[in-house]
Amino acid sequence: MKENIQTTLFQLLKQKIAGEESIGNALSDLLSVSPDAVYRRYRNETPLTIQELKKICNHFEISFDALCEMGDGKVVFSYPPLNTFDFSLESYLEGILKAFQKLKSLSSPEIILSVNNVHLFQLLNFPQLVRFKLYFWAKTHLQIPDYKDKHFRHEKTSENAFALGKEILQIYNSIPSKEIYDFDFMRGFMRQIQYYYKAHHFEDPEYALFLFDRMLLMSSHLKEQANVGKKFMFGTQVPASGNSFEMYLNETINSDVTFYFNSKEQQGLYLTHNIMNYLETTNQSYVSDSKMIIDKQIANSSLISIVNEKERNHFFYEFERTIHLFRKKIEADLES
């Protein structure tokens, strides 16, 4: 086997099992060889046999065709297929939690995030907003038949979904992050609420006002985090240490959502895909190129957490002013 294919395969395996167990333990039982024999293959001292390659690819759901085609300008991504979702809040959060648990298991992980419209992790402080976002995705974008004749209505978030969201938030908050925002933050989300109101997709039209009220709480909480430069859950106290939060303002526009992570073991990237799905890769060339771009985004943005109070206040003033404008339009229509 070509050395670069075997090397790439083991890089993908490290990505898939990161933090769960060692390469040696993960493959010794599967291949019926000792951990030492696995590491000889890992170091390219011993080539994998065709049967070993088949077992690995089948077990870890890796495309051998993609491995053979790897080269300059070609990248292997992994993603959760849509057929693995049942479009419940629980199902969606379970996939995100698994990714965060893998990230948290790495040594000294850090995050750099460019936010395009919605910040899902901050949204988790207010589960009703996440539930609406997922419902909109399933009914309007994917047109799932089960949602065709349904109206969105108020439902209490299940205990399981609440626990999943809380665990994701706890991990996200604990990992130092640099985050780039722009003035279009959450504007698309507001238009989605307005669209559902006009299309009579709310069982209770006044629920649209409730969602805008939750957005105002979200703005207040995000601003409080920016003031102190620390992430923490809504309704809790600011932590004495850790949870570092650097908030940057890009005065033009963030064209996409890029979630870059770095640790002592590896660096990688998540990209949004099909609106709310995501792609993941640890391809060194692609990740390095993306890191270079996001570093330039930060250089062209203004730090507004802790410092630059004037710019920070202006950002949140414009954000809340827009929320109030959308809310007042619906409120006036309800009263007419």
Label for each model-derived stretch:
Residues G73-K150:
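Helix-turn-helix/homeodomain-like alpha-helical modules used for DNA recognition
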Residues M1-I5, L31-Y39, L124-K133, Y147-G165:
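Charged, low-complexity, helix/coiled-coil-prone segments
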Residues T8, A26, A37, S88-S91, ...:
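Exposed alpha-helical structural elements
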Residues W137-F315:
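Hydrophobic protein-protein interaction segments
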Residues E311-S336:
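Charge-dense, low-complexity intrinsically disordered regions
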Residues L12, K16, L30, A99, ...:
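Residues that form generic nucleotide/phosphate-binding pockets
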Residues K16, E20, L103, S107, ...:
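Short secondary-structure junctions and interdomain/linker hinges
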Residues M1-P80:
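Basic, Lys/Arg-rich alpha-helical nucleic-acid-recognition elements, primarily the DNA-binding modules
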